[in-house]
């Protein structure tokens, strides 16, 4: 079994290589630092890797505000609004918003299930990941995923239906970067018009706007792609195991090779 690195030296290395160098996302220096009360409040609740990132950057934005580390206490009303009345495929637990995008996509961390829930407030969709939740029993994976929550950041991917450009890029050019307590929001909201046009965007108060979106539309649970991938892997393993006893070793290998070729063509 491979021993995966997970200590704070690895966390710092991943910050440098994945976030600052590969993504090229420099911190804006526009947020605020994390006080000792936050570290004390979340010590033992969140991985040490998360607390390290907090101490390293504070609640700051990156790449002209495309991505923000969030204060989970400030963002608690938004989380509550989106989870209210929503049946999740996880045990009951407290969820915290650890980061978000310029347009309000949020990555939530469950105290039991970890980074197993993303929220898309524009489409009204919550995306679960049972695969991530399953890793939380492993201390090493918990620490690594705490780091990856920030070094593999969420990105706004909506395209302007007229220009074909990323909506967030057009918004930054026209409106400037959003601040710590701001998001870009459509007026009227997308859930009312279905129009994805950057010209309809304005700068909104983040908490008020995202709570409004939670109350203005039905919430839907998106497909858990991690569960689907696990089912496919299990089915492949079952199929491979079922074929080999049927004939000679050569026949079994040939059949397995054909199956692998078909699978590669499909995926």
Predicted feature locations:
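A surface-exposed partner-binding patch
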Residues: 1-117, 172-239
